[in-house]
Structures are given as C-alpha cells and as structure tokens.
Design a protein with these regions (language model features):
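Outer-membrane beta-barrel signature, preferentially recognizing the C-terminal barrel domain
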Residues: 274-297, 441, 448-502, 510-539, ...
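N-terminal periplasmic "start-of-domain" segments of outer-membrane beta-barrel proteins
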Residues: 65-95, 123, 180, 244
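Short strand-turn segments of transmembrane beta-barrel domains in outer membranes
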Residues: 164, 172, 179-213, 224, ...
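Flexible loop and strand-edge segments within Gram-negative outer membrane beta-barrel domains
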Residues: 229-236, 240, 254-338
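Gram-negative outer-membrane beta-barrel transporters
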Residues: 405-409, 498-500, 522-602, 655-657
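Extracytoplasmic beta-strand/coil segments of soluble accessory domains associated
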Residues: 101, 105-141, 145, 163
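Structural signature of Gram-negative outer-membrane beta-barrels, strongest in the C-terminal barrel
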Residues: 351, 355, 365, 381-501, ...
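Short acidic/polar hinge/loop motifs at secondary-structure boundaries
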Residues: 141-170, 183-186
Length: 658
C-alpha cells in the first residue's frame, strides 16, 4: 500500500476489495482509490464492458473516482470508546424495516419498546438498562433529552440517510450509564437525489426526498419526510415530519468543519401509551437541534471542538382536545433546552497517543408541572397556559486518556472528573485488544459511569406517580469481554458482560391515602449479566447476506422485597435471522425472523412471540418498486403490558434515485 501525505490529507491506493473501516481509526480525511486485481479501468471502455457477462461483478468491485471519506471517529473524547456495529446500509439497505426503530429492534444488545407503530414513540435501552440510562448520539453529538428518555430518540432523521449505527461502550463521566447509541448520517453517494413515496394499510402514507451535492471539499446532505397514518386501533393516528441537513467542508488550511441541523414535528394519538386507564391521550412534540464540529491537525497535534443545542417542546393531553376532561384540567406543557460545548487536543508520539479535553453541558426546563415553582409564571407560546415551574443545572467533564499499540496488543485508558449540582464524580475506563491471528482478535474493557436523575424522575407527580426531588445520581461499573473473527465474507462475534449498578432510580409501589402509587425511589442495587452472539455471511450471487444473532441476559436486585417498575422488566432472550436473496432479473427479497422472550415480574406478564417481516423489490436503473409486510404472521404481542402492538401491516412504494 502506497501512502502520501500532504496538507493533512492522506491518500491511499488499495488493490483489494476489503472495506475501509481501518481508516476510521485515523480520525482524518482519507482519500481512497481502488482498482480491481482483475483489470485496470484505464484500459476498459464502457462499450466493451457492457458486452461481457462477467463485467457486472467486476464493476461492482471498482471505484471509478477517488472517494473522499470523512472518518466518524469519536476520539478524542472522554473515555475509551469501543464501537460495535448495529446497522450498515451496505448490508441492510433494503431490509423490511422502514424505521430506525425497526432496525434497532433486531440487535441482540438493544431493547426497543414501541408505543404505536412506524416509530411513533420508542424507548431504547442497552443490555438491561432503562431508556433513561442510554445516551443517544447523532453523528457523535450527544442529543439525549434531560427531561425524559421517552424523548431522547426524537431525532429528525429517516433510515434512508443513515449510513451506520453503532453501540458505543467505554464512555466515562455523566450520561452513558449503560452505553450509547450513535447514528451516523451519510449520503448514498457524493452527488444524487432520491425520492420515495409509499402507502399501505391503516391509511399509511410516507413521502421522502433526500440528496447530496459534493464540490471542492464541500458536501451538503439534505432530507425531508412526512409520515402519517389513521392508526391501527382507535386513537393511534399520527402525523410526523422531519427536516435535516448536514454540511461538511474540508480545507488543508482551515481543517474540517462538520455542521448539522434538523427539525421534527410529531402529532400522535396515544391510546393507553402512558396509562391504560386513559384511552384518549394525545401528544404533540417539536424538536430542533443543531451542532458544529471542527478538527484540525498541526503535525503531531490534533485539535477538536464542538458546540451543540437541542430544544424540545412537548404538549401532553390526558384528554385529547379536552374531551371528557374534568373542570380545571390543563395539558402538560414542557420546553427543554440542552446546550453543550467541548474542546480537546491529541498528541501522537513514540509512546502512542495522548489526549485531554473538557466539555460543558447546560440542561434547563420550563414546565407547568416539573421543576421548582416560578415567582412569575411565563406564558406558553401559542397556548392559553403558563409555565409555572423551571429547573436548570450545569455539568462539567474533564478527561485525560492515552492509547498505545505494542505489537498485536492495543492498550487504552482514560480518567475523567465530572462536576454537577450533586458534587464531583471520578470515573475511568480501560480497554485491551489482542490480535490473536489475522482476522481473529479478543478484547476486554471496564468502565465506571453514572447518570443524573431526569427532570421527570425528580418532579413528576400525578394520580398514579410521585416524584422525588431528593434523588441522587446512579452509578455503574461495567465489565465486558469478547472475541471477533473475520475471514473473507464471513464474520462472527461473541461477548459477555457484567454490570453492577448502585443507587438505582426506580418506581416502587407505595401505599398512600389515595391508594397505591408508583414513587420515584433510590434503594436498589442491580446486577446485570449476559451474552451476545452474532454471525454473518455476505454472498456473491443468489445469497446476498445472512445474519444470525442471539442475546440473553439476567438481572437481580438487592431490594427483593419491593415491587419495582423497571429494574426487572427486561428482554431476557432475543434471537433473529436476517436474510437477503438476489432472485434475478432485478428482483430481490429480504426476510427477517425474530423471537422475543421478556422477563416476567409480579406486576407484568409477557408471552414469548415470533415476528416475521418480508420485503420484495424490483429495480432497474434509477427506478425501483417494493412491497413489504411487517408482522407478516399477524402475531399478537406487547412491548408494554396491555398496550397491543400493530398487527400485520402491508405497504408498497416507489423509489427514484438519480
């Protein structure tokens, strides 16, 4: 492999079909040129290529133009991060999942619990954690909601612009108690436009347009979509829209600038979503977000900086439109602001790479139910209501990390000191990776992490729940070991983990003068352990790909005599098979089968169930059509007790890509 370096841009010429994942570790702009061993594109003209039957396969292995790749590296950042791939557009780009939630549901480490269908509202948790214990990143930027994890996944992006999704382990400091999920947006190719229209059962309609332009170091990705349905049962209708753009600019003198901005609006009927006693619930949310990142190398030094902002407005109606509401009832209004900034520097030297940095985050909420009482209420924009409560908090993290490679062994360690209204918290992470032989490696890591109580944990009180403003942060110590094997088109991974959590926040059944209620309490220690296995094969002809995965886990809590709401309500077993078949003449089929077995508790009871999803597509040139069905077997299943999920849902659509 020949390497040239000029003005901070590294160029590689590769004579193989292998992926470019290794370049992500550089954290730089990489320019790649690829040629097939079988032939040189210099001597191949278009007419002769079209006349030979084997050239289709050969052309798939060639890149006519050099492809500029901006590495989505999270380092330098606090902690020793270890990414695990969840989704890749290259493998599952035509899978029968139209939503990000559908993709995440199949991964053995992720528990996706939906209210409604097609991604209307979803809680995402990792390895037995809760939705509040999972950090959500978009292009490496933390956009986790400080009010409630119910809103953390409200991101203005669709699956068509998602190039990859990773689980991130090893983040220290405040936020990623159980880990993080990072979604990366990338264009289909440097210059394109894509439109999609689909429709189906239950009045479903989806329209989407996206595209990208790349010129002289500048890349602009933009997308917009509308998704609506009448609902599969009464009061599960929805009307959601997304707008998103990502702009990157690379200059040898100024470095790399990476900017993103988005807006989402959602209106959805919430039949029993948060309480089965109220079938006429309704929710309206608006989310706006933006961030800018900068990266510049100066010889052995690399400087990184970013700033971000996320605003979420929420109107929750226990009685939709006030119908049947008692006198004096008003909706719940919340507006949450999350702002953050980070700066770090890395230095590469003979003993490895050393980095140091700091970040700052500010959380604030105005609400008519959450927070401390305002002296002077503030009118809710566009509503006949007032914000009567507010709360704000400042969070700091500072870290120092180092990584080194000694032959086939990679070592990394990080120390972090976090500050918040709850005091200071030291944390750390360690990671070791051993290359056993070509294509086979083993790794182990340990991380100490924490999370702050959400504003809902602290203050939410209603007819069935009681908040607790005296809650303190949760703490966790997580250990993980694993091994990976890769040979040609086959790859496999096996891992096991153990997490000890203390000061766990959970809702505990408490007797009150008004009857039994769920009170936000801090009394539980929780031990969680599990295994994950995954194997996949990418074929050349009829079999495009096949992936088999399994995840199993168990948890035990110290306060066994208390009935808790979330601690033992987890996915006990999950198995999935994903298969893609090239039928020929432009036809392709994708089938996924998955099995779920959730742990039962004294307050919940779930039956194991199978789900089968399928998609049939036909493509020619820039045009493709498809028909797909989710829950093809019409399985009756629940992510939450009593809240039935959608039955068989058939849709069909048309896609034009130019």
């Amino acid at each position: 492999m020949k390497k040239r370096s000029k003005s901070g841009v590294r160029c590689f010429t590769r004579w193989s079909r292998k992926g470019y994942g290794a370049f992500a570790s550089l954290g730089k702009v990489v320019k790649i040129g690829v040629l097939s061993l079988s032939m040189s594109i210099i001597t191949l003209n278009a007419k002769s290529a079209s006349a030979q039957p084997d050239t289709v396969r050969l052309l798939r292995e060639m890149e006519i133009e050099a492809l500029q790749v901006t590495a989505e590296r999270l380092n330098p950042t606090r902690g020793v991060v270890t990414p695990t791939a969840v989704y890749s557009r290259d493998t599952l780009g035509i899978a029968p999942q139209q939503t990000i939630e559908g993709v995440l549901r199949l991964n053995p480490a992720i528990d996706v619990r939906e209210r409604g269908g097609k991604g209307v509202q979803a809680d995402i948790s990792l390895r037995g954690g809760t939705y509040d214990q999972t950090m959500v990143l978009l292009n490496g930027i933390d956009f986790t909601d400080a009010r409630t994890g119910h809103q953390s996944h409200s991101l203005p992006v669709d699956i068509d612009i998602i190039g990859s999704i990773d689980i991130i382990e090893g983040l220290t400091g405040i936020g990623a108690y159980a880990g993080a999920v990072n979604m990366v947006t990338t264009p289909l190719r440097p210059n394109y436009m894509r439109t999609e229209i689909s429709g189906g059962a239950y009045g479903y309609l989806y329209s989407n347009i996206s595209g990208a332009i790349t010129r002289n170091g500048l890349s602009v990705l933009a997308a917009g979509s509308v998704r609506r349905s009448d609902g599969y049962i009464e009061n599960t209708d929805f009307n959601n829209s997304n707008l998103f753009t990502r702009i990157t600019y690379t200059s040898s003198s100024a470095g790399l600038f990476d900017m993103q901005a988005g807006y989402q609006r959602r209106d959805f009927g919430s039949n029993g979503f948060y309480s089965l006693s109220f079938p006429d619930q309704f929710e309206h949310t608006e989310t706006a977000l933006a961030s800018v990142k900068w990266n510049r190398s100066f010889g052995r030094f690399t400087l990184n900086a970013n700033a971000s902002y996320r605003k979420n407005n929420d109107r929750y109606e226990l009685y939709r439109g006030g119908k049947g509401a008692p006198e004096g009832w008003t909706p719940n209004y919340h507006t949450t602001d999350n702002a953050g900034a980070s700066i770090s520097a890395a230095f590469r030297w003979a003993a490895g790479e050393t980095s140091a940095g700091a970040d700052y985050r500010y959380h604030h909420i105005y609400s008519n139910v959450l927070g401390d009482l305002l002296t002077h209420p503030i009118r809710v924009p566009g509503a006949d209501a007032f914000y009567t409560h507010e709360k704000g908090r400042n969070i700091f993290n500072g870290w120092l990390s180092h990584r080194v490679r000694l032959g086939g062994t990679s070592l990394a360690g990080s120390a972090n000191l976090a500050g918040s209204p709850y005091g200071t918290f030291p944390s750390w992470s360690l990671s070791v990776t051993q290359q056993i032989m070509e294509g086979w490696s083993a790794d182990a890591n340990a991380t100490r992490s924490m999370r702050l109580p959400t504003f809902t944990d602290l203050y939410y009180t209603n007819a069935t729940h009681i908040g607790n403003p005296d809650l303190k942060p949760e703490h966790a110590m997580t250990y993980r070991v694993g091994t990976r094997y890769h040979a040609g088109r086959f790859q496999a991974a096996l891992s096991g983990y153990y997490r000890h959590g203390r000061d766990i926040i959970d809702y505990v059944q408490t007797e009150t003068p008004e009857g039994m209620k769920w009170k936000s309490t801090q009394l539980t220690e929780l031990d969680t352990y599990g295994i994950e296995m995954q194997a996949s094969y990418r074929g050349r002809r009829i079999l495009r790909h096949i992936t088999v995965s399994y995840g199993g886990m168990a948890s035990s809590k110290a306060a066994a005599d208390h009935i808790t709401k979330y601690a033992l309500d987890y996915m006990k077993h999950k198995a999935a098979v994903q298969c893609g078949i090239d039928i020929g003449k432009g036809f392709a089929a994708e089938v996924t089968a998955s099995w779920y077995c959730r742990n039962n508790t004294p307050d919940t009871a779930y039956a194991p169930y199978w789900l089968l999803d399928a998609r049939l597509s036909w493509s020619r040139g820039v045009f493709s059509v498809y028909a797909e069905a989710t829950n093809l077997l019409d399985t009756k299943y629940y992510d939450f007790v009593g809240l039935i999920q959608p039955p068989r849902w058939i849709t069909a659509g048309v896609v034009l890509t130019i």
